[in-house]
């Protein structure tokens, strides 16, 4: 009999995926089964070269990934690769997981802490409302394209009127963001903008 309620694990993963905070998984070893499904619910995943291994081992046990793996993996890596991960139940090394899109990036063991912390710190300096609504807009990509575009336009218009947006856009222009030289270092200029909300 089909249960229309989400399981507790599904509910937890959806709360992580849709919460208004940024979630980052730093995977420094093996992640499989429910752990892989939980990590796939995060906004970003980072691994260690030669150490991170991803696996969905359920099918050989006579079951299937029941914690959101059959739904999240195709969205991350595509249908064919998701089939290979789920049906093949073989270890996916860090390099392949990055190339396929399960991991955002991979780093050496001596680099990962600093790299992930730097990204988290960078994001934490940006206006909170912009981070939250940008995440909500990306999550709206699960909607049909017309609805997703409408949601993006609505959220963009909401943010455009905020004090933080007005302040940071003005600061960006004052720092030369509209110049040819500024365009060549837009990442650096963006990092100089702080919270105004």
What do the PLM-derived regions correspond to, one by one?
Residues 3-7, 49, 64, 147:
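Residues at secondary-structure transition points
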Residues 8, 12, 69-72, 81, ...:
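Hydrophobic alpha-helical segments typical of transmembrane helices
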Residues 89-94, 114, 121, 125-197:
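C-terminal alpha-helix plus adjacent terminal tail
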Residues 2-6, 56-58, 76-79, 138, ...:
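Short C-terminal domain-edge/linker segments immediately following a structured domain
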Residues 5-8, 38, 112, 152:
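Hydrophobic alpha-helical membrane-association signature
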Residues 1-28, 188-197:
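An acidic, glycine-rich surface segment that forms the CoA-thioester-binding/catalytic face
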Residues 14-129:
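Crotonase-fold acyl-CoA enzyme core
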């Amino acid at each position: 009999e089909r249960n229309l309620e989400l399981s507790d694990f599904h509910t937890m993963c959806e709360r992580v995926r849709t919460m208004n905070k940024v979630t980052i998984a730093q995977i420094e070893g093996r992640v499989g089964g429910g752990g892989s499904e939980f990590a796939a619910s995060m906004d970003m995943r980072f691994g260690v070269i030669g150490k991170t291994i991803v696996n969905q081992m359920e099918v050989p046990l006579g079951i299937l990934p029941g914690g959101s793996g059959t739904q999240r993996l195709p969205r991350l890596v595509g249908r064919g690769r998701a089939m290979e991960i789920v049906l093949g139940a073989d270890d996916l090394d860090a390099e392949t997981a990055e190339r396929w899109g399960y991991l955002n990036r991979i780093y050496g063991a001596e680099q990962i802490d600093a790299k992930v912390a730097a990204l988290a710190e960078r994001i934490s300096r940006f206006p909170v409302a912009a981070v939250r609504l940008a995440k909500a807009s990306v999550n709206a990509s699960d909607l049909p394209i017309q609805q997703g575009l409408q949601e993006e336009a609505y959220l963009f218009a909401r943010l455009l009127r905020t004090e933080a947006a007005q302040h940071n856009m003005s600061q960006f222009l004052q720092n030369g963001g509209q110049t040819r030289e500024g365009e060549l270092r837009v990442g650096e200029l963006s990092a100089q903008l702080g919270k105004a909300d």
